[in-house]
């Protein structure tokens, strides 16, 4: 069938946007033996994408209730956490860090710190029960799980069972709950006011 006027408009717009020399120019590459069509000018990694936000340092990035964080403030926490994950827990390319919390600002900070190390984020359903959390953590085998107070309450009863299979470190966010061995508090290890000036070096391939 003939394209509608609206469809023709979208097609011509896309052709203009993806034309040679444009920001959204397309190119053909082979990824692990599979031919793919990709954006020629896309950032090569999520770390590179995050680093592009440095130009917006003083702008608000996250607003949570009465809390506001600029890009620069978030970036400082990201650098601090990334160095801690690498230095204290050996997190690097190919490793996994799990996140189990409501939509706190720390969720986003953990995401960027993790991918900036070349590690994978394991996003866990915040509604999961203790048994579901145990299954997910045993299946994903992360080095670290970062949890808020509600998720920590569900995790603690099954933590010993999980650790029978996974050498798991637990980091709590916005929680005063007593912690067992091999646990830490975000507030004790993430220091945005004294963060390193740069992210840790990381060897990340675009296809990781």
Region roles according to the model:
Residues 1-43:
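Flexible, non-catalytic linker and terminal segments flanking ANL/adenylate-forming cores
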Residues 118:
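Structured binding elements
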Residues 128-158:
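Conserved ATP-dependent adenylate/AMP-binding module captured primarily in the ANL superfamily
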Residues 25-30, 47-70:
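AMP-dependent adenylate-forming
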Residues 141-143, 160-174:
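Conserved helix-loop-beta element of the AMP-binding
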Residues 184, 194-208:
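Conserved pre-ATP/AMP-binding loop-to-beta segment of ANL
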Residues 41-42, 58-112, 129-134, 138, ...:
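Conserved AMP-binding/adenylate-forming core of the ANL superfamily
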């Amino acid at each position: 069938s003939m394209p509608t006027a609206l469809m023709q408009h979208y097609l011509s717009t896309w052709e203009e946007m993806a034309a040679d020399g444009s920001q959204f120019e397309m190119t053909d590459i082979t990824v692990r033996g599979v031919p793919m069509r990709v954006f020629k000018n896309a950032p090569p990694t999520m770390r590179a994408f995050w680093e592009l936000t440095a130009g917006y340092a003083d702008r608000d990035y996250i607003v949570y209730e009465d809390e506001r964080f600029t890009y620069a403030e978030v970036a400082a926490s990201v650098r601090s956490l990334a160095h801690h994950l690498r230095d204290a827990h050996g997190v690097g390319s190919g490793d996994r860090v799990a996140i189990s919390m409501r939509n706190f600002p720390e969720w986003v900070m953990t995401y960027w710190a993790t991918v900036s190390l070349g590690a994978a984020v394991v996003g866990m359903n915040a509604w999961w029960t203790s048994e579901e959390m145990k299954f997910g953590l045993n299946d994903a085998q992360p080095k670290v799980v970062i949890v808020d107070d509600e998720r920590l309450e569900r995790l603690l009863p099954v933590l010993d069972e999980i650790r029978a299979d996974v050498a798991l470190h637990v980091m709590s966010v916005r929680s005063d709950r007593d912690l067992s061995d091999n646990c830490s508090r975000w507030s004790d290890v993430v220091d945005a006011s004294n963060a390193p000036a740069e992210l840790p070096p990381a060897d990340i391939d675009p296809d990781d």
